[in-house]
Amino acid sequence: LPESPDINDKWPSVAESYLPDGLREFRDYPAVSLGWMMYVGMAVAQCWDEDWQIYGNMPDLYAYLRDKEGFDLMDEYIRRTVLRLKTPAYDETEQLVQQCAERTLSALRREPLEPGTKEAFDAYVACLRQLYQMGAAVQLHRLNYRMENLRLC
């Protein structure tokens, strides 16, 4: 899967800013709490492709994305405005994120974790990171980036 060190390096600041929103939503909407991070990964990849000199220097890229239309509508904002998706890609992306979030949630629930513990928190953050990276990879692939083996020598 395509990846970028710049996008990966943005993870700590994205996660720190996202966690208060994600944790608040997890109780009532756990799949949303997970899935929205995949959208954020897609948006960060799109920003990386468009103008990383600007977006890469934003101190809180997540808040920039969220505050455009709010947390609840962030998925639609990212698909419509950031990624500029039209039907059918708009709907297919929604289905992909929903499936990934639900499968991740199912795997998380199968873990022998006590809610409210450090271990449960760490597992949640690990899931968010994977979804962020998956979202970035999906968008980089959509933008026709491909990973290739390099021959040195």
Predicted features by range, described:
Residues 1-153:
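Intrinsic-disorder/low-complexity detector
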